[in-house]
Amino acid sequence: MTPPRLFWVWLLVAGTQGVNDGDMRLADGGATNQGRVEIFYRGQWGTVCDNLWDLTDASVVCRALGFENATQALGRAAFGQGSGPIMLDEVQCTGTEASLADCKSLGWLKSNCRHERDAGVVCTNETRSTHTLDLSRELSEALGQIFDSQRGCDLSISVNVQGEDALGFCGHTVILTANLEAQALWKEPGSNVTMSVDAECVPMVRDLLRYFYSRRIDITLSSVKCFHKLASAYGARQLQGYCASLFAILLPQDPSFQMPLDLYAYAVATGDALLEKLCLQFLAWNFEALTQAEAWPSVPTDLLQLLLPRSDLAVPSELALLKAVDTWSWGERASHEEVEGLVEKIRFPMMLPEELFELQFNLSLYWSHEALFQKKTLQALEFHTVPFQLLARYKGLNLTEDTYKPRIYTSPTWSAFVTDSSWSARKSQLVYQSRRGPLVKYSSDYFQAPSDYRYYPYQSFQTPQHPSFLFQDKRVSWSLVYLPTIQSCWNYGFSCSSDELPVLGLTKSGGSDRTIAYENKALMLCEGLFVADVTDFEGWKAAIPSALDTNSSKSTSSFPCPAGHFNGFRTVIRPFYLTNSSGVD
């Protein structure tokens, strides 16, 4: 038995050697210039669905295979039905792509097609007669070496730091004038140019000048700020834009939070509103990690004044947030008035009565701001003990204010966690649901449907009906599930379309109250290191963005995840009062 098995394995491997993802071929056409379109991906050949298939798409295939163009774009399995997976669907090319893999589509292996919809092409019989020798890849390095030689120059470049020369280089006007990125240098009259640079950016000047020659540059977490600053100062718009696009990628790479704080300060100093907004968003979603980092005591007061009012602050609880502010205040960086201003932004009604009582015993800030704490505690106790209709009638309280609404609380009291089953196969619990019977809980992270179904990450949990102590004995039951396929949506009673998958599904039972509504959130977790995005539950489903920028129709995560997928998802329940009492949850 062994030799035949090895023989077939050898044939399989030999058949795919030298083939790369995105390579294409024509099958069953009876001639070399026509056939069913097949494309290679992850070790196997598959077909393309004819949804949106047109002559532009067909021409990309033909040109990639050496033909001049396509004369027909055929569908409905005109050359017979293929086998294997349907690799691409809803392909939309512009005509300049090297492969269908480079065109817009639903993404790899995302299709509802069957093989009776396989796409085909007929190409012109003429093959391209042009044969090109292209050594242009060597040009970049050759130009870089001209700069490295520092010989044959006609331009002197001085690097000045605070009025003193720090470095000197020579340049070649004929090369620099060919690059608009370098126009700030060659537009200067005469043969001498002075660059005024901050001391921290001096080590990057050489790489910047070499980039003007080679048009290639390597950028890291530690250098991106300086390259952005230099590019902004000297009109290198492409480099400036590229650095700006890297901020979202590089921000999460520093677990110490020194770089995000540094970039925030840089954004404020330069008036870069987009970078400032990006930094604030990252710090808000990852606020718990920030409070545990070494950089926490050095967070500027003005930054905290912007972060603490936000409802998208992700923290275990309001008490945990107050304790973090208490720890921060030990650094004596802020005045008494500034600290009091920060305490004002704490949402005391979101802390339980026993937590409020214990503040006087375990919080160093309490006695130095006793009057404020007593006022805030009284406000919170009224919220916890008096029905909101009476508070609104007799106290004139506006319970739609943020003070009376939860943030993103990640403690088990208000949240639950599931993994992506493709990333982790932990099955510590099991829940079974028959086709006709009710859900029966044995204990669980994963859901086992009948034998023809798959396992899907699943979590059932309970929360209080509302943060007010009036509702502490009233529990709401929730079920959270990761839904990667149309079938999984059907299994759990959700309606999904292929272009929105995967999604998170959330169901609620018990605790119905027309005065309470929910603004629930889903946190996308990357490698257990940072929150990459936060999405809303709309109609009991929360979108899961693409972890990396792809050609799919899905939106990309605010902060890309290098792993290419999220390792887990945390759902946070956020109840609030409907003060007009007319809404439904």
From Swiss-Prot:
CDD domains noted in UniProt: BACK_LGALS3BP (cd18496), BTB_POZ_M2BP (cd18304)
Cellular component, GO annotation: blood microparticle; collagen-containing extracellular matrix; extracellular exosome; extracellular region; extracellular space; membrane; platelet dense granule lumen
Disulfide-bonded cysteines: 49-113, 62-123, 93-103
Natural source organism: Homo sapiens
Subcellular location: Secreted; Secreted, Extracellular space, Extracellular matrix
Domain SRCR: 24-124
Stretches assigned to the BACK domain: 260-360
Domain BTB: 153-221
SUPFAM superfamilies: SRCR-like
Glycosylation sites: 69, 125, 192, 362, 398, 551, 580
Known function: Promotes integrin-mediated cell adhesion. May stimulate host defense against viruses and tumor cells.
Swiss-Prot/TrEMBL keywords: Cell adhesion, Disulfide bond, Extracellular matrix, Glycoprotein, Secreted, Signal
Signal peptide: 1-18
Superkingdom of origin organism: Eukaryota
Name this polypeptide is given: Galectin-3-binding protein
Assembly with partners or alone: Homodimers and homomultimers. The multimers form ring-like structures with a diameter of 30-40 nm. Binds LGALS1 and LGALS3. Binds ITGB1, COL4A1, COL5A1, COL6A1, FN1 and NID. Interacts with the gamma-tubulin ring complex (gamma-TuRC), composed of gamma-tubulin, TUBGCP2, TUBGCP3, TUBGCP4, TUBGCP5 and TUBGCP6. The unglycosylated form interacts with PDE4DIP isoform 13/MMG8/SMYLE; this interaction may connect a pericentrosomal complex, made of AKAP9, CDK5RAP2, EB1/MAPRE1 and PDE4DIP, to the gamma-tubulin ring complex (gamma-TuRC) to promote microtubule assembly and acetylation.
